[in-house]
Swiss-Prot record:
Biased composition (Basic and acidic residues): 1-14, 100-176, 210-226, 233-259, 291-317, 362-371, 378-417
InterPro entries in alphabetical order: LysM_dom (IPR018392), LysM_dom_sf (IPR036779)
Ranges of compositional bias, category Low complexity: 35-52, 266-283, 418-490
Protein name: Probable elastin-binding protein EbpS
Organism field: Staphylococcus haemolyticus (strain JCSC1435)
CDD domains: LysM
Compartments it resides in: Cell membrane
Top-level taxon: Bacteria
Stretches that traverse the bilayer: 335-355
A GO CC term attached to the entry: plasma membrane
UniProt biased composition (Acidic residues): 21-34
Ranges annotated as biased composition (Polar residues): 70-81
Gene giving rise to this polypeptide: ebpS
Biased composition (Basic residues): 53-69
Membrane topology: Single-pass membrane protein
Amino acid sequence: MSKNNFRDDFEKNRQSINSDDQFEDNTNEFDENSNESNDFDNQSDQQFPPRNAQRRQRRRNQATNKNRKFGNQNSDSNANGSLDDRHDEDSFNELQHNQQENHLDNEPIHKDDKLSSEKDFNNDASRRNNRHEASNRKHDKDYDNGSLNDDDRHRRNHEEGIDERQDNRNHKDQQNKKSRHGKDAAIAGGAGVAGAAGAKAAKDKRKKDEHHDSKYNEHKDDRDLNNDNQFDQNRKHDKDLHDDHRDAKDNHSKEEPKKGNKGKKAAVGAGAAGAAGAAGVAAAKHKKDHKNNNHKDNHSHNRDHQDDHRNHKHEDGNDGFQAHNGKKKRGLAGILLPLIALLLILAALAIFIGMYLNNDKKDSNQADNKTEQTANKDNNKDSKDKASNDSDKDKASSDKDKDKATNDDDSNDKATTDNDSSNNSSDDNSSSSDNSTSSNSSDNSSSSDNNGNNSNSDNNNGNSQATSNNSSQSNSNNNQSNSSNSGQQTHVVSGNENLYRIAIQYYGEGTVENVNKLKQANGLSSNNISNGQKLIIPQ
């Protein structure tokens, strides 16, 4: 089979991959960065690019760059350790360039690996060994197979073997040109490279352990912060967990030197075997280191799983302990809490009842105040009405008194007028008596003087009797007039008064009948009256 039968148009048209600059950047990061082991482990799962002359040339160039990298460590191992370095560098750079190409092809491979791991688990005796073998087999299969089918893998492996044999022949030619001292240096260089690989593995292991310890410490700190109340109870469990972790770490550290010693022995044997077997031993060493790394990863994963399981149990234990403490505390709490709840309920009820009673009292007081206010208002109204009535009565009485006073004045005036008229009548009577006496004296002049004197005396007596009779009559007339006037009133006209107004004032109504009474009493023929005129007001 020809080497180029395998090519197609896609591979022929591919551009060359010159990754020297990228490799130099990666070597600088490899020396400076503390996480180079994780990067190498992640990139070791990737696949190789297609097999062609460009790839082989790149491998040779990378081998020389790798030798320059390790020149500071050991000058004797630069030329003779190129095979191991070349193999490691190929796996490092080729996996780095094909990371994106094989991302979509990993899912079916993982499914096949899962089936193969389950099959190996049923056939092996120990669960841990079977799990390690399944993981190692998975990574070997990812490393060897890629996304090609079985025929392509067979052809690729065949071409890879041809390339490796050709490289070995070239390397043998170079080795034959050198002296035996160069061969011894190659053996020492191979041993040094193996030791460096072992040291690197130990360093990676220490870093992983430190990373795991930091994770564990962070988890423990968080757990201590969340469980401050159960610090005394958790301290014992944390101590046991730390002891178990330390024992597991010690056991793992005991297993690692053995594996490292095996790797060193294999490297020394590879150096002694010569240039022809160096490639095979290097491949075996790489696979073995790959398995050891997988074993370490699986062991750390199992250890993390155990820690998580223990933490889960510990948290369950804490929950149970808290529940147990809750049951212990529930004795007093079960007694006190209901009592406190009852007291609070009773206090609330008492407060509401007091507020209700106070509101009722306030309402009743307000109602009483309202009734008192209304009663006071009614009393005030009654008193005002009484006062107004009293004032009206007083006014009426004062008016009556005034009317009586005016009537008395009128009666007194009438009495004076009557007395005047009686005096006039008495004067008339006296004059008439004088005339009679004169006539009598003239008639009786012819009589004697004695008779004349007797007659004069008799006349005087008669006159006195007459005057007495007249006075008695006048007095009787005055008494009659006073008695008659006592039932009547007088009114002096003033201003613009008329009979209608006077009738309204004394009778309450200005009717025609009342006006006629006034006319008849006063002898008036018309309604005309003058100011200052006195009118008699009949009853």
